[in-house]
C-alpha cells in the first residue's frame, strides 16, 4: 500500500497536517465516496486502511463480507494501534 500516493490522490498532498480543515473534510468525503463505489476487494481494503489511519473507517465487521478481509482489518488495526502507542 502506498499511503502517500493515496493521500495525494484524495487530498492533493502527502502532508495532510498542512491542510485547512475544510480541505481535509473534502478529501475525507472523496475517500469515503470512492470506498463506497469500489468493488475490487484489494483496493477496497487499501482504502479502508487509509480511512482507519485518518480515524474515519467504518467498523470492519459489517463492512467486509469476506472473513479473511475482516481478519486482515482487525490485524491492521492492532498493528497501527501498536505503532501509535510506541511513538
Give, region by region, the residue ranges found by the protein language model.
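Long, compositionally biased terminal regions
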Residues: 1-37, 41-87
Amino acid at each position: 500500500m502506498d499511503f502517500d500516493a493515496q493521500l495525494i490522490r484524495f487530498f492533493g498532498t502527502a502532508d495532510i497536517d498542512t491542510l485547512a480543515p475544510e480541505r481535509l473534510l473534502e478529501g475525507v468525503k472523496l475517500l469515503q465516496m470512492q470506498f463506497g463505489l469500489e468493488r475490487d476487494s484489494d483496493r477496497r481494503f487499501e482504502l479502508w486502511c487509509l480511512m482507519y489511519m485518518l480515524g474515519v473507517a467504518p467498523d470492519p465487521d459489517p463492512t467486509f463480507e469476506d472473513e479473511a478481509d475482516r481478519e486482515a482489518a482487525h490485524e491492521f488495526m492492532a498493528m497501527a494501534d501498536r505503532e501509535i502507542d510506541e511513538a
